């Protein structure tokens, strides 16, 4: 009887060892699906994208027609691109990435500028918003859309509760009126036009000017009062002074570089620069800076 028990134990031991091995393998496999404890990961982080004017006033989706969010990792390599809505709560969850850089552009898809076609892994510094050139001889570009821009950095220490991600206007506005221009030139025939100089033709994803210099040829026409008027149009922001060339039949007639008090023509993001050039008698130039969309109505003196 003792001998039978001994043989029974010998037979059962291999089975027990096999079961222990299988159990250990299952536990190991289960752990393999879990994140490595040594790899940091950003917990789900929520934010709301909001838009503001130059004075901090809140703007709605009647102003922001489209909104694209670009998510970059700690090395500024693209992780993801998402189309979102204004004031939508956006949750970001990218395991293994404890630092993120977010860049958002509003109205970039409205067609008056070229947005970058980024792929996963592309570096932030290779991304640009570019003007569409309409003429290469100067060169001349078309007016961009009402662009908005914002950027924010997220770290592993950031509060996971919803955070505000602000966007602000990333273009400047210009409106030009010329009085008694035909009398000054001495002709009612032929084409008149403005050339506005200069900005760069690109904005990078830091929101800074980049690229090469470009000019603008805004739409303009004579109104019923004989004033040559260019309604408000957009240009890329610039810290340099701008200049306005006035042409007739492709011949430069004059260049406006400052007002009558010597103040240079300067634009500001989210503001409208109004310029009045009066050619009656001594040439007089007035300028004013107004809120976005509020073009100055010049009174006849």
Residue ranges of each PLM-predicted region?
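Bacterial Sec-dependent N-terminal signal peptides
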Residues: 2, 19-55, 270, 286, ...
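Phox homology (PX) phosphoinositide-binding domain
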Residues: 255, 263-293
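Tryptophan-paired
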Residues: 63-118, 186-266, 298-301
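Short, low-hydrophobicity acidic/polar segments
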Residues: 77-169
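Structural motif
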Residues: 48-63, 177-186
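Bacterial N-terminal signal peptides that target proteins for export
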Residues: 2-13
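A sequence/structural signal for flexible, mid-protein segments enriched
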Residues: 136-226
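Solvent-exposed, conformationally flexible loop/turn segments
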Residues: 97, 157-160, 224-227, 267-272, ...
């Amino acid at each position: 009887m003792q001998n039978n028990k001994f043989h029974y134990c010998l037979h059962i031991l291999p089975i027990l060892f096999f079961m222990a091995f299988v159990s250990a393998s299952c536990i190991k496999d289960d752990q393999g699906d879990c994140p490595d404890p040594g790899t940091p990961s950003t917990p789900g982080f929520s934010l709301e994208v909001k838009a503001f004017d130059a004075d901090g006033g809140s703007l709605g989706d009647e102003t922001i027609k489209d909104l694209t969010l670009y998510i970059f990792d700690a090395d500024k390599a693209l992780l993801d691109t998402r189309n979102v809505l204004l004031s939508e709560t956006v949750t970001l969850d990218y395991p293994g990435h404890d630092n993120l850089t977010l860049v958002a552009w509003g109205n970039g898809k409205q067609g008056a500028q070229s947005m970058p076609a980024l792929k996963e892994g592309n570096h932030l510094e290779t991304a640009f918003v570019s003007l569409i050139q309409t003429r290469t001889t100067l060169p001349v570009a078309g007016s961009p859309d009402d662009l908005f821009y914002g950027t924010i950095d997220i770290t592993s220490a950031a509060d996971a509760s919803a955070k505000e991600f602000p966007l602000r206007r990333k273009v400047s506005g210009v409106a030009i009126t010329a009085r008694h221009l035909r009398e000054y030139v001495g002709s009612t025939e032929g084409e008149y036009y403005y050339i506005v100089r200069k900005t760069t033709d690109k904005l990078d994803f830091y929101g800074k000017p980049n690229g090469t210099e470009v000019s603008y040829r805004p739409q303009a026409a004579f109104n019923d009062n004989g004033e040559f008027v260019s309604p408000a149009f957009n240009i890329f922001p610039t810290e340099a002074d701008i200049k306005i060339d006035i042409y007739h039949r492709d011949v430069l007639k004059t260049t406006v570089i400052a007002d009558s008090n010597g103040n240079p023509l300067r634009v500001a993001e989210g503001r409208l620069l109004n310029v009045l050039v009066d050619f009656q008698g001594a040439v007089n130039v007035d300028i004013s800076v107004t809120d976005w969309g509020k073009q100055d109505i010049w009174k006849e003196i």
